[in-house]
Every structure is written in C-alpha cells, then in structure tokens.
From Swiss-Prot:
Protein name: Short chain dehydrogenase gsfE
Enzyme nomenclature, EC number: 1.-.-.-
Higher taxonomy: Eukaryota, Fungi, Dikarya, Ascomycota, Pezizomycotina
Function in brief: Short chain dehydrogenase; part of the gene cluster that mediates the biosynthesis of griseofulvin, an important antifungal drug that has been in use for a long time for treating dermatophyte infections. The first step of the pathway is the formation of the heptaketide backbone by gsfA which is initiated by priming with acetyl-CoA, followed by sequential condensations of 6 malonyl-CoA units. The resulting benzophenone can undergo a spontaneous dehydration to form norlichexanthone.
Free-text disruption phenotype from the record: Impairs the production of griseofulvin, but accumulates the intermediates dehydrogriseofulvin and dechloro-dehydrogriseofulvi.
Keywords: NADP, Nucleotide-binding, Oxidoreductase
Protein family membership: Belongs to the short-chain dehydrogenases/reductases (SDR) family. Highly divergent.
Record note on biotechnological use: Griseofulvin is a spirocyclic fungal natural product used in treatment of fungal dermatophytes.
GO molecular function: nucleotide binding; oxidoreductase activity
InterPro entries: NAD(P)-bd_dom_sf, PRISE-like_Rossmann-fold
Length: 377
C-alpha cells in the first residue's frame, strides 16, 4: 500500500525540503498522498497532484486540532514535525515550542489510526552548542548538558518517546546543524540568504566583505546541513524498521574553516574577501562571546543600496527580501568563540550514505534564491 505523509511547517526550510524530496524522487505507488500543513497559505516550488494542503496552527487546543485533522489523516502513515516558533527570549521560546509539539503529537496520535512513524526535527541546539563549548563533534548518545536556559528540544524528544510507549508506531529524531537551503517563504533564520545579501550589497558598494565574527571562530572548525540532505535522511530512517526509535545527527558530512570558506562564497557572488582578514579586537578566550563588528548595525543604512540594486536589475519584487534577512541572527551565530560540529557516524552505521560538499550547498542555494526571485544576479 502507498504511504501517506503528513508534514508540518511545510513553508519552512526543512518542511518544504521534505515536500520537494517526496515529489521529486518518489511515485504515487510509493507515496500516494502528501498532506502539508502550515499556519499561513502553502507556497511550494513544486507542483504535484499528491499534495493536499490543510491550514493548521498547533498553538490551538488538541480537541479542535483532532476535529480538523481526522478528516484528512485517516490514511496518514508517516508524520514529520518541522514546526518552530522563533522567540528572542529563551524562556518564551521554551514555552511556546514545548506546547506546539505536545499539541501536535497528541492530535496526530488520535487522528491517524494507520500511523507507522513520527519523526521530529530538533537540531544541534540539543547539545547546547549555542550556549557554551561542548565536546565536538557531538554524538547522539552524549550526556545532556543543562545550561542556564531550559532546552525545549529535551522536552520535545522526551514527550515523543513517552507518547510512543505501547503504541504500534515508531519514532525518529533528526538533529541538523545550521540549515542551508531556499524556500518560497524565507524568514529571518535563513543563514544563506543573509550571507548572499551581505555579499551582494558589498559588491554594489565596491567594498570588501569581511566576516562579522572573531578571530577564534574564523579559524575554528564548523559544519552545516543542506536542507535537501536533511530530507533525504529523514525519509531514509523513517521508512526503515532497522532505524526505528533512534535519533540521528545530519550534516553535509564535511568540515570547514570560515577563514577559507568565506572568501570562496564571496567570490561566487562577485564580492571580495580575504583569508588573511585582520581583526581589530584581540583573540578572545574560548567560551567568550565576541564580534569584531555587528552585522545588525552594519545593515541599518543599506536598504537603499539593496533597493537600487534590485531596480537596476529589473527585480523590484526582491526589495522585500531585505526585511527577510537575519542580520541579528548572523551576529548570534558568529559571536561564538568555539567550534561546534556534529558526528554523522551513527547514520553511516545504519546505512545512510548521503553527502554534500558544503561550498556547493551554499552555491546551489544562492542559485535557487535567484530562481525564486529573492535576490538579483
């Protein structure tokens, strides 16, 4: 029997990547229906008659969710939770995202009698690598590290395991690093979009494009996760009994230093950056937070530069992209003074062989931004 997917957060990077993966790599004999949900109208880069959209907000109470979902979830076999509500305040973020998943898992368990698997996407923040230095590369069975803020990923994963006990369906957890990808409705957490806009503005100004970071992070090791690759692993593990009830890290499978990656990315968009970048501030100690300069401050007088560039290239619709960039998010990511990477050895042991050159993942994503009309050439 064909499987039926139920994908939440379908307008986000990971949710839309799963939709595209199923549409582009499977047939109706394998996946008969792809039910997608989001709070806002669904916008996809693919057209497929198997796609069915239902507007859902998992902030709502479980009973109302079940009432809406039971009409379309009778055949659902695989549910993929990719929803996330961003809040700048860590305590508020914990509260809303904890409730979001609790409502989802309670509702899908009641509304989908044929359910076989529920896959939850959390992320590298599960290891608290965004808060302090952690053993690197982080592995799925590393002891939990409890920082100054409650980690809603802990709660979500615990809720998933507890809900599954005694049920016929299995669970999986997917933990990516910083996600590199493009979607029709980007928002401020898209790292690649922010980088692309920064380079294009610097190119327009004829100025150099140094990385807004510190010397230790510049010279340290990093990794990223390409959205289509996340989708590939997600479908791989959720459809194999040998992978049931397991958590998996997912990255591109390579490591890099920003010192050498940043100039290559700049060059791909016609901007200039130097691997011998000089820093005004002294080398920080590991565990400190430091920026040589702030991207969020830098961007404050750059709107007109961006709009003039869009007008000159006949792409007025891309002007709105300026407000979609994550300027402050860039500061948050690049102020770290420690390397934080994930091991994908467990996924390899379970038979997954996915890999993507990280430089190419950025370049392909930049190309897709252009195709979507989000940035000029």
């Amino acid at each position: 029997m064909p499987k039926t997917a139920f994908i939440t957060g379908a307008n986000g990077l990971s949710g839309s990547a799963i939709v595209e993966y199923l549409c582009n790599t499977t047939t109706s004999d394998d996946w008969g229906s792809i039910i997608v949900t989001s709070r806002s109208p669904f916008k996809s880069t693919v057209m497929d008659p198997r796609i069915k959209f239902i507007a859902l907000d998992f902030v709502n109470d479980v009973s109302s969710l079940v009432e809406t979902m039971k009409e379309v979830c009778g055949a659902v076999t695989h549910a993929y939770f990719c929803s996330y509500l961003h809040k700048d305040d860590f305590a508020e973020s914990y509260t809303v995202n904890k409730a979001l998943f609790e409502n989802f898992i309670a509702a899908i368990d009641k509304a989908a009698p044929k359910l076989e698997n529920v896959t939850l996407q959390t992320g590298g923040k599960y290891y608290n690598l965004h808060v302090e230095p952690v053993p690197s590369p982080a592995r799925e069975n590393d002891p939990r590290r409890y920082g100054p803020f409650e980690n809603f990923y802990f709660t979500q994963e615990d809720t998933l395991a507890e809900m599954q006990r005694g049920k016929t369906w299995s669970w999986n957890v997917i933990r990516p690093e910083a996600i590199i990808g493009a979607n029709s409705q980007p928002y401020g957490l898209n790292v690649a979009l922010t980088i692309a806009m920064y380079f294009l503005i610097c190119r327009e100004l004829g100025s150099a494009s140094p990385m807004p970071t510190n010397q230790r992070y510049w010279e340290g090791t990093d990794d990223v996760s390409y959205a289509p690759l996340i989708a590939d692993l997600t479908i791989f593990v959720s459809t194999r009994k040998s992978c049931a009830n397991e958590a998996f890290n997912v990255t591109n499978g390579d490591y890099f230093t920003w010192r050498y990656m940043w100039p290559r990315l700049a060059a791909s968009l016609g901007a200039k950056a130097d691997s011998q970048q000089c820093f005004e501030k002294p080398m920080p100690g590991e565990g400190e937070l430091q920026l040589d300069w702030s991207l969020a401050e830098w961007c404050k007088d750059k709107r007109k530069v961006w709009e003039d560039l869009c007008d000159r290239q006949g792409l007025p619709g891309a002007k709105a992209t300026f407000d979609l960039a994550g300027w402050a998010v860039g500061d948050f990511l690049y102020q770290r003074t420690w390397s934080a990477t994930l091991s994908v050895n467990k996924a390899r042991r379970f038979g997954w062989t996915g890999h993507m050159d990280s430089y190419q993942s950025f370049v392909d994503t930049f190309d897709k931004f252009r195709q979507l009309g989000l940035i000029p050439k």
